[in-house]
Amino acid sequence: MLQTDNLTAAQPQRIVAAQTASAQEELLERALRPKTLDDYIGQHKAKEQLAIFIQAAKKRGEALDHVLLFGPPGLGKTTLAHIIAKELGVNLRQTSGPVLERAGDLAALLTNLDPHDVLFIDEIHRLSPVVEEILYPALEDYRLDIMIGEGPAARSVKIDLPPFTLVGATTRAGMLTNPLRDRFGIVSRLEFYENRDLATIVSRSAQLLQLDMSEEGAEEIAKRSRGTPRIANRLLRRVRDFADVKNNGTIDGGIADAALSMLDVDVQGLDVMDRKFLEAVLHKFGGGPVGLDNVAAAIGESTDTIEDVIEPYLIQQGFLQRTPRGRMATERAYLHFGLPVEK
């Protein structure tokens, strides 16, 4: 039998991937995580809105309206959920959509909430339909409607819940059902970060890690971090390793540049995977337009990986366009690879 490559097999984590790579990285993220809105850097519009809504809820002595946070991974949705709970002065219970398999799983969480507590559900777009159905009355009326028993003996039991705030986070807002989306009173989209905000985040993390780093070093890391704080902090740790060996632990612009070049992260934050994708569109498909399935087959990646991991940053940075006819490389992509621009 012919052996074929398993394109869905687990692959090594990219250093510029926005997803959390390991439990160890998760622990370090928690240590570097800001605790208040004042400490939270960037996302100025979302932060300003949340500050007003939180103050208003506290002034009235009410639970904050349910909050939906959406945007690409690594931009601070989990951090904001923790900050919301801290600013409100209440407890936070955290779970994720895939974990809540049965209605009873959600019921157990909801019935253990104290008044005004925050329930944070990450990947809320992955809730099962059964769980989502019992969530509706909980969000609207602070009430659980649970069916007990089966067949003719089945009966509905209503359980009153304390007022609470659901904070849902998702990278795929389009996958939320309309009834669920409509039950969020506050909806905030998190955007990719500006380099100046990322440089501030890198400098703050360096201080917490007690690193000797110049302003130029922070800026060099920031501009290659793909607009994502999680990536910036990961690159900072790898640059720290390089500096410990090559420069007695001091991180300046030159050391940061040398370290990141060694890691194949170029000045635009593109890594080998990004360049492979763009080169396929440019060289194998004449710059496009090309269908997603075709380019996925050409580079040996799943369409989900391309849509969720590779494309968002390339589109945001103007290297790629999505058109009704397929993906197309932009003028900036041609120039980045030193190619003549197609007219």
UniProtKB/Swiss-Prot annotation:
GO molecular function: ATP binding; ATP hydrolysis activity; four-way junction DNA binding; four-way junction helicase activity
Reactions accelerated catalytically: ATP + H2O = ADP + phosphate + H(+)
EC number: 3.6.4.-
Annotated family: Belongs to the RuvB family.
Protein role: The RuvA-RuvB-RuvC complex processes Holliday junction (HJ) DNA during genetic recombination and DNA repair, while the RuvA-RuvB complex plays an important role in the rescue of blocked DNA replication forks via replication fork reversal (RFR). RuvA specifically binds to HJ cruciform DNA, conferring on it an open structure. The RuvB hexamer acts as an ATP-dependent pump, pulling dsDNA into and through the RuvAB complex. RuvB forms 2 homohexamers on either side of HJ DNA bound by 1 or 2 RuvA tetramers; 4 subunits per hexamer contact DNA at a time.
Complex and partners: Homohexamer. Forms an RuvA(8)-RuvB(12)-Holliday junction (HJ) complex. HJ DNA is sandwiched between 2 RuvA tetramers; dsDNA enters through RuvA and exits via RuvB. An RuvB hexamer assembles on each DNA strand where it exits the tetramer. Each RuvB hexamer is contacted by two RuvA subunits (via domain III) on 2 adjacent RuvB subunits; this complex drives branch migration. In the full resolvosome a probable DNA-RuvA(4)-RuvB(12)-RuvC(2) complex forms which resolves the HJ.
NCBIfam families referenced in this protein's UniProt entry, alphabetically: PRK00080.1, ruvB
Free-text comment on this protein's domains from its UniProt entry: Has 3 domains, the large (RuvB-L) and small ATPase (RuvB-S) domains and the C-terminal head (RuvB-H) domain. The head domain binds DNA, while the ATPase domains jointly bind ATP, ADP or are empty depending on the state of the subunit in the translocation cycle. During a single DNA translocation step the structure of each domain remains the same, but their relative positions change.
Protein name from the UniProt record: Holliday junction branch migration complex subunit RuvB
Lineage: Bacteria, Pseudomonadati, Pseudomonadota, Betaproteobacteria, Neisseriales
Gene responsible for this protein: ruvB
